[in-house]
């Protein structure tokens, strides 16, 4: 439950960072591109919230999924999140593979009206596989469309993750 609250808080904070920044006059938003990954950071005199993110874009330009990593102050290691549309089969794991090698299967942590989320603290080996890889393949099951497989570029991930770690 604590991970779910933290995950939602971080996701919501970064999604609404512009609004948050406007309410904190000293807030500074930093965004840096690392090929297919982006480093975003909202810093104020009170706190700093940073993430790296990549989006899976549909043919019509919409966002199908978003993958992100955050380093949290609790010292428990990086928080990995996947946000996908609702109407996914919550009983089916999200399968991930890197360069055609199975990597991990993650269950959903929670859903809200906008999306369903995976929120995990992956092992170092998971992150190292992403750093060495070129392409991440994600498979999930929609209750409407069946299995959906999407490819996610890992170009720039290593540099973006290094930036996130500081």
Report each predicted region and the residues it spans.
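Bacterial N-terminal signal peptides
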Residues: 7-18
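A generic "folded-domain core" signal
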Residues: 21-166
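Positively charged n-region of N-terminal signal peptides that target proteins for export
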Residues: 1-5
């Amino acid at each position: 439950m604590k991970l779910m609250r933290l995950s939602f808080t971080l996701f919501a904070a970064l999604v609404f960072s512009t609004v948050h920044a406007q309410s904190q006059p000293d807030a500074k938003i930093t965004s840096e591109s690392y090929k297919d990954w982006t480093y975003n950071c909202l810093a104020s005199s009170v706190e700093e919230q940073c993430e790296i993110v990549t989006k899976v874009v549909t043919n019509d330009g919409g966002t199908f999924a978003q993958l992100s990593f955050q380093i949290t102050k609790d010292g428990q290691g990086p928080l990995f999140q996947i946000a996908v549309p609702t109407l996914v089969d919550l009983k089916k794991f999200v399968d991930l593979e890197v360069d055609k090698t199975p990597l991990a299967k993650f269950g959903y942590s929670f859903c809200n009206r906008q999306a369903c989320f995976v929120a995990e603290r992956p092992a170092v080996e998971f992150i190292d596989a992403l750093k060495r890889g070129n392409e991440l393949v994600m498979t999930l099951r929609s209750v409407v469309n069946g299995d959906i497989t999407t490819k996610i570029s890992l170009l720039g991930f290593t540099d973006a993750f290094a930036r996130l770690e500081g």
